[in-house]
C-alpha cells in the first residue's frame, strides 16, 4: 500500500522541517515499511552541515528511519485516532557507510524485530542508489500524550 504525504501527515505528528518521510512505497501491517526521503539542497540543515560541502547528518538519517518505523507501529493499530505518540527509546548498532548529499533519494526500510507491550525494536536500513548508506537497530515506545 502506497501513502502520499497527506496520508503520512495524518499518521506522524512531525512537520516541516522535521518531517523526514516524503512517500511510503509499501507497508506490511505492523511489520515492515519502505519509504522515500528526497534530499534537497534547500534543507535547512545544510546551512551549517557543511556550508562548503553539504552532507546530511547521520542523526537525520536515523530520525528518518525512526519515523518510517513509527508508520509501521501505527499501521498495526486498530484505533488510529487514539491520543498516543511514538517516542525514540534507543539506538544500537548504528553504522554509516556513505555520505548522503543533496540530490540523493534515501530509500528507508524498517522491519520489526521484536515487540513487547508498548516497546518495539526495528532493523532499519537507508540506501542511496541501492547502496547501503546507513543501518541501525531502532527502539521505539508508544506513550499516551
Label each PLM-derived region with a short phrase.
Residues 1-2, 69-107, 133-135, 141:
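Hydrophobic beta-strand-centered segment that forms part of the acyl-chain substrate-binding groove
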Residues 5-15, 82-83:
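Short aromatic-glycine motifs in intrinsically disordered, low-complexity regions
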Residues 9, 52, 96-98:
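Beta-strand-rich interaction surfaces with strong enrichment in secreted/lumenal proteins
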Residues 13, 101-104, 111-145:
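HotDog/MaoC-like acyl-thioester-processing domains
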Residues 16-56, 61:
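Catalytic strand-loop segment that frames the active site of acyl-thioester-processing enzymes
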Residues 22-25, 92, 97, 111-113, ...:
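Conserved positions in beta-strands of structured domains
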Residues 24, 56-80:
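Active-site helix/loop of acyl-thioester processing domains in fatty-acid/polyketide metabolism
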Residues 34-36, 109, 123:
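Beta-strand residues in well-ordered beta-sheet regions across diverse protein folds
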